[in-house]
Amino acid sequence: MKRLTVIVKGWPRLSETFVAQELVGLEALDLELDLWSLRHPTDTRRHALHLQLKARVRYLPEYLWQEPGRVARGIGAAFRLPGWRAAFAAFLRDWRRDPTPNRGRRFGQACVLAAEMDPATAHLYAHFIHTPGSVARYAAILRGLGWSASAHAKDIWTTPAWEKAEKLADMAWCTTCTAAGADHLNALVPGKTHLVYHGLDLSRWPAPAEARAPRDGTDAQDPVQIVSVGRLVAKKGYDDLIAALGRLDKNTAWRLVHIGGGPLKASLQAQAAAAGIADRIDWRGAQDQNHVRAALAAGDLFVLASRVAADGDRDGLPNVLMEAASQGLALVATDVAAIPEFVAEACGVLVPPGDPASLATALQSLIGDPTARARLGTAAQSRVQRDFPFARGREALYQLLHPCLSPPTPL
């Protein structure tokens, strides 16, 4: 079997555990991978999963001016490839509709990739159809290879329709991790996109060894532990969560543990201070998977207040919901994007997005009812175990990839 070249936007990324889980899982099925990243890492921590990847990891020039010699050699080599004329024509068509430095950078990166990728490469596979998809597409045309992609969330909802449609028509197949995303993409190019849930590798998420204490919010010395994990960006709705927490009964004992970094941290901390709840929130920043698992295991309740951002960005199906469910936590989340595909009535509470009052009502009710939390948490744990196993999604992806990498059967 030949090699698969995988293109990602950044590696490693703490917020994209689903990518690491998938690639390590594919290697376990004996696929030979080369990983190319458009960006260098910005996270100072890594998940254990990142260290388990055996593939070579290489970084394309993040900005073309940073490595002018390498870029010049890449363009020169790409110019001599049989696919140059077709690839450059595709780039020019895109440039006319998107004349941005970002578009030019992706073509330059594609030239470097096409020049430097392993000659044994049989197929290219991009995680996210926006910028990684552009690099994969141009490089595939240059080398005369097939390509495919996995679409997720922001890339689906913020990429122009013309670009998505042309990429889908050009690629062998696409996968996406939500039914909402699959419906949207298949409306553009029917039959090209497959629904493949990431699922959760439960061997990495064992259930907590000890039962939770029945905290009910009446003991200030032992408050109910609310946990939320997510980047501090608009689509995660943390301003709505803080507004909801500020509405809770002042005599209710609760504490929020938040894990994740992001550009809105200072404004959210100021909002919490203005609401008089700053001393109840533990902002832990970006953490590796071991710390996330420990926080979830120690928690009583998980909350995620996602919404659609002004630019159309939104969540897909956040993996952290499955991670919280694996730890037997009751879930409070918003009825937006693909969240309802996992959070059913029996295993959690859904509230309208952008509605702090409804969110506060749901939190107040569950903080004071440990029996309901236990019932919902048990149901959530059963749902992830039964309906979202990692092996199922990995096998579906393998069945798509394998024909792209295997030599044709002799007639």
Language model features with spans:
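A conserved nucleotide-sugar
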Residues: A115, A220-L232, Y238, I242-W283, ...
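Acidic anion/phosphate-binding donor-loop and adjacent secondary structure
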Residues: P160-E163, N186, L200-T218, D222
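Carbohydrate-associated surface elements
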Residues: A180, G199
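A short, well-ordered alpha-helix in the C-terminal region of glycosyltransferases
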Residues: R280, S358, S365, A372-D387, ...
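Short alpha-helical donor nucleotide-sugar binding micro-motif in glycosyltransferases
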Residues: A286-D288, A294-G299
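Acidic donor-binding loop of glycosyltransferase active sites
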Residues: A297-G312, L329
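Short hydrophobic beta-strand element within catalytic cores of glycosyltransferases
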Residues: L321, S326, A330-A333, V343
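Conserved acidic donor-binding segment of nucleotide-sugar-dependent glycosyltransferases
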Residues: E345-P356, S365-T371
